[in-house]
């Protein structure tokens, strides 16, 4: 997926550096093409396509191209510290192309579940009275949000994993495994607006649904969990050629384990975080970190084509 011959000015240019010891180096290409039924006369877009730096992730290069070039483009960080780009398009257009290219290093060493030994009830109690800095920061992610409703059914679903005194890492991973084992990945079963309660009842959905479900279950117990958007490196079966553009955007979650410690969990695949996961942004739910959202004037018809290539 080559970038346009005359791309819009990149957010940042940097020469890729050698990967650190114990890190996997990736180049990620993300292409979004919007096709409209009529001319768009005015458009506002908010993009979460710029990866954030984390303790386990180092961004060594980032380029963004936009065609047609925006009339206004500004860059800043949102409430959660995620980089975001705001665009205004003032000229008529029937197609919008947004392409990014990311050079990034992801550490292979991750926090071990066995080290997350604080009993889950202790963390719940800390969040009830968040006097420590870590608890105060985490408390943002302990309550219901627009796309994550809480309730008794979700609490009841989580409780078999959260027996009395069980360490947070062990309990949260058990819940991750249960979602993976008991639910079916089905891209036709849900939409972006499907409530968490419906996902729990039907036991079908996609990565976004399963992340929201586990977040809702954890918060219903009084724990803190945040939604993470990013990319997943996929490996084709033996003997099968790798298809360029066939990698995927992905969603998972992080549960707060005390102080400044968070544990990534991927219920879609039933495993903890690994170097196969590349973080873009995190927030309370998908609505905080949607790759692209906004308002257009001029057409009620649009098609979106997305291609992702994770080369590691």
Regions found by a protein language model. Name each.
Residues 119-205, 221, 284-286, 298-301, ...:
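Secondary-structure boundary elements
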Residues 35, 157, 161, 195-199, ...:
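Short, hydrophobic/aromatic alpha-helical segments in well-folded domains
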Residues 3-4, 177, 209-298:
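Hydrophobic/aromatic-rich core segments of domains that either
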Residues 2-129:
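Intrinsically disordered, low-complexity N-terminal segments that are enriched in acidic
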Residues 76, 116, 181, 188-196, ...:
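Glycine-rich, flexible loop/turn motifs
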Residues 21, 200-204, 242:
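Alpha-helix N-cap/helix-initiation motif
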Residues 47-57, 62-65, 269-290, 294-303, ...:
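Glycine-rich, small/acidic residue-mixed loop/short-helix segments
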